[in-house]
A protein has these predicted regions:
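Active-site micro-motifs of SAM-dependent methyltransferase domains
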Residues: 5, 51, 103, 107
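Hydrophobic alpha-helical connector segments
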Residues: 8-43, 64, 95-101, 147
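Short, flexible helix-adjacent loops and helix caps
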Residues: 11, 15-18, 50, 54-57, ...
Length: 147
């Protein structure tokens, strides 16, 4: 259920008034925001996947089998397919794009520099680091799918 909630949050940044690449940027910003709320969340997620490897398979399978897909993921999948058909982005599976975004985002918090924890680092340094990483990930993902 917890992993399902994470993907249901996908619906929030999919603003219909924005172009597709801006929506991707919103998704990255949104997931960063969730992980910034509690510095224990990223290690918890990674630990859950390591300690319970079957959960990763269940998570991925949930979005590959049509009968059990979430409505948020269906919407995202439709947007990706539409952009591929229009030639705006390179061919990519929606699940792979989403997992790339999620793994790049979470890795920012897992491989952060020593002394990065909120109580070990001044807030400006922390904000600068997170902003730089968010921009780098946004550029990497968008440049990787843009045609």
């Amino acid at each position: 259920p917890k992993m399902e909630q994470v993907v249901e949050y996908l619906d929030a940044p999919l603003d219909e008034s924005l172009n597709f690449l801006d929506r991707i940027s919103n998704i990255i910003d949104f997931y960063f925001g969730i992980l910034e709320l509690d510095e224990r969340l990223a290690p918890f997620i990674v630990n859950e996947l390591i300690m319970h490897p079957g959960r990763w398979d269940m998570f991925r399978d949930r979005f590959l089998r049509n009968e059990s897909r979430s409505s948020a993921f269906d919407r995202f999948d439709g947007m990706v397919k539409e952009e591929v058909a229009k030639g705006t982005i390179v061919p990519v599976e929606a699940i792979d794009l989403l997992l790339n975004i999620m793994s790049l985002t979470i890795s920012t918090f897992i491989v952060a520099p020593k002394g990065f924890a909120k109580d070990e680092c001044d807030s400006n340094s922390r904000k600068e680091y997170l902003l730089r990483r968010k921009e780098n990930i946004r550029d990497l993902v968008i440049n990787g799918i843009r045609k």
